[in-house]
């Protein structure tokens, strides 16, 4: 039982506690000893509660008990203080009143109290029914009151505690908690307490071992041979780091805050001494340290819990089958036959994963295998990496027909992959706060590998049929796996990661004896892995010169197919939000056009133009149009219209506008987009300088995102503009409501264009917390194209509502006409490209400077 001196009249318990907490916070800022902080905070609250209990004259027959984390003797700066008011029997009205007054005074002291009032029998009953209550009482600690009553509670509690049942319940609870956080420690804003790899995963281990009598500290688990010395040291170090992060989060937020929110990541990183450099933000350096700790905790949690399970549930079931002299399968898990295998034969480390791939029915690695891998780090040195046998095994792992993704993920989880590929280790846990990627670099790479592999699996052929078809005809799929593994391996080093990664890939191919034909393709893919995406999304695919240049870069069908497959896998592996049907269409169009050119098709603009027109005429005849009805409209169209639209689009807008060539009123027509998502909208109207801005403003007010815009002015001064628009969650364009929205857009947009109103100020749309915390520095690049006829305007900035309208409004104000617009939204980042009429810009340098300045202002958050 603890005792404490009564407070003097001049100092209330609240004042004493407040002063002590402030002193401890200042001490922590100076020395950063988190274990001292949480222990002393708990002691300070102990003293305050004991003083209050005595001042209130609480009955000697009752006991005040600390439970939960507070019972463990730890309190974080703004954690709840969980207490149990233990009674010998159910309280009468008078005692209830006194207990309520006591709890009220606890709140008055500034404590966030979580209280329960129970008898011993009620405690046991609740603990039997609710594992959360059972866990809270597991760490109970007497503060003051009737010690005999508390000992009775302890005896009854221990007598009813079933370690095996407790283990099963906590395992289920942990799996449910992990599922809530998507089973990954690598979220953008992880919860340092609850996420996989967080403090809770460490507490689960100690709860289970305490309940089973195996120990309640890492040292006790070491003594009881549940941990090795290295594991105990690692667990203590990672626990200390996670506790420090949690304590600093509480202090920075001024309240209980366990989530590493974007708003606090930079400040938290600075508190740890990180500073930004050319390659990494402060927040990225902090999060890498967190992810490494969470990864280690996840790995050790799995190892230790499997060992606890083996102790609690000893099984008589023997080896299911012997695989070879080094490995056996037991209940679907791959075990090493000898705990010293890796120390004796380091080559068996990589063999583990090859056997895992090749052995049907094996679903994971057993606890003894995981532990042996964890403790074999010193074996995985430069000599081990240079061993020809290990190099052959690693290449064989990448060349297997199945199991590659799972094997590589296991290799990453056990840190074997980073120990074999040293440069891969450098990007493990590296987050990119670019508003684009939502995975760490290592997780992104493994996601891309997974996407490439799925193209080769028959069961997944329905997901991306065209990719699956190409992969089925690709002679060596493993080449793409190697390229995927290296495509972003040089991220965060500074410099061009494609060039640096290419050098890494070339070195790997040479060291692993990969044939020159395959090595050349791998190296080329790593160097050019962004090329196809950039051409498809930022250049004019209707320009034969663009296609000819890209075809020259690619050179062959094999290279084209490989690049296309890697590009699709890469974009889909950045974020669930980035891939859409429009990007799929652009990439597939570029693939098919380039394939025709590689097969000998002409890129002569005149031949392409005539071929496109003839295709459109055929479609118009099929639509029962008079063979000459289109001629009046087409006579007013320049070559660009026919080169930038495919035959189906030309036939579509021709059918709607052919008999309205000289209309005085705007005409708007819309249809379900041929790509399968969103709408395609065509506008035909007497031209005006602010037309593009008006249309942009309308779509943004409706919550529709413009993905692509093709802007043309006819020979007689009319605008013929087509737009590809999507619904990014506004709910406006939903299956079953297309007819209504098409009618609405056609009517409202035509009416808006016809009005002679001043362009409204662009809205300052709300931006996300992530965008506020990690804004993209706006960039404006304005330069003439090779022919000097147009100017290319490239922009990148943080996305927000109203941004495109703000850009269009600046262009309209300076009477600069837009010819094409490629709107590329990557998560919360935009990278837009506009082709502008160059006549006014060529004649006026001041206009160029004014345009760039005002655009930068419009892009600013």
UniProtKB/Swiss-Prot annotation:
Residues 1-322 are annotated as: Uridylyltransferase. Keywords: Hydrolase, Magnesium, Multifunctional enzyme, Nucleotidyltransferase, Repeat, Transferase. Its EC number is 2.7.7.59, 3.1.4.-. Uridylyltransferase (UTase) activity is inhibited by glutamine, while glutamine activates uridylyl-removing (UR) activity. Residues 323-679 are annotated as: Uridylyl-removing. GO terms for biological process: regulation of nitrogen utilization. It catalyses: [protein-PII]-L-tyrosine + UTP = [protein-PII]-uridylyl-L-tyrosine + diphosphate; [protein-PII]-uridylyl-L-tyrosine + H2O = [protein-PII]-L-tyrosine + UMP + H(+). The keyword Transport does not apply. It holds the Pfam family GlnD_UR_UTase. Gene3D superfamilies: 3.30.70.260, Hypothetical protein af1432. CDD domains: ACT_ACR-UUR-like_2, ACT_UUR-like_1, HDc, NT_GlnE_GlnD_like. Residues 680-763, 792-861 form the ACT domain. Has four distinct domains: an N-terminal nucleotidyltransferase (NT) domain responsible for UTase activity, a central HD domain that encodes UR activity, and two C-terminal ACT domains that seem to have a role in glutamine sensing. This is Bifunctional uridylyltransferase/uridylyl-removing enzyme. It comes from Ralstonia nicotianae (strain ATCC BAA-1114 / GMI1000) (Ralstonia solanacearum). The gene is glnD.
